[in-house]
C-alpha cells in the first residue's frame, strides 16, 4: 500500500520492509554503529549509518524504474563509506574513503569498473539532473524553479529524475555532469556523496560552501563546471 506523508511525499510498504531488512543486517554486522533511516529508525552512535531504504519512492509507486537503496557510513559530516544500488539495471555503486569509486553488478561478482566524472567544461555541453522540495508553496521550491529554468536555457538539457541517489551515481559514472537539488535530506544524499567525491566530483551548497549533513541545497558537479554553476545559481 501507499501512504501520503504530505500531498506529494509518499511511503510504501516496500520502503518499510526494505528498511527493516537493511537495519537488521547493519545491526547484526556492525552492532556498535548508530543508524538513522528515513522511515524512523534511530540508533545513536559515533559512527552512523544513514539509510534511505528506497530513494525514489514516488517513481516506485508509479512503476517508474528509477529508484533504489542508499546507505552511507558517517562520522559527523564526514562520509566514510557509500553504497547505492539500482535493482532495475543490476548496478551496484560503492566507495570507501581514499579508495576510489566503483560500479559492479548487484552481486558484485564481475570486475568492478572504476568510476570517473566527465571533463565537460562548458554548460551548453552539460547534461543535468535536478531535485525539488516537496512543499510546492515554499520559497525554496520557487527559487529552485527559477534555477531550473536558468539551467534549461544554459545547459544541453536538464532532467528531473526523482532519485537523488541515482543522480549522484550518474554524476560519478560520467553519465551526467551535475545534480542540482533543493530540499534534500541527509538520507537522500549520504550514500552517494563519497561516490561522487571519489570519482573526482565536487559537492557544496549553492553558495559554494562545504556541505554538512544538515545542508538542504546541494550542488554536485564534475568539478570543472562548479564555479560557473555557483554564479548561475545565485538568487538575489
Positions of predicted regions on the chain:
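N-terminal subdomain of lithium-sensitive/metallo-dependent phosphomonoesterases centered on the IMPase/IPPase/PAP
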Residues: 1-54, 231-234
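Residue-level signal for inorganic ion chemistry
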Residues: 15, 26, 57, 86, ...
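Acidic, metal-binding active-site segment of PIN/NYN-like and related structure-specific nucleases
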Residues: 31-35, 200-216
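Short secondary-structure boundary segments
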Residues: 38-39, 132, 182-184, 207-209
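Glycine-rich active-site/cofactor-binding loop and its immediate structural neighborhood
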Residues: 48-89
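Acidic beta-strand-loop-alpha-helix segment within the catalytic core
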Residues: 72-167, 215-236
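Alpha-to-beta junction loops
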Residues: 173-178, 201-202
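A C-terminal functional module that forms or caps the active site or interfaces directly
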Residues: 191-198
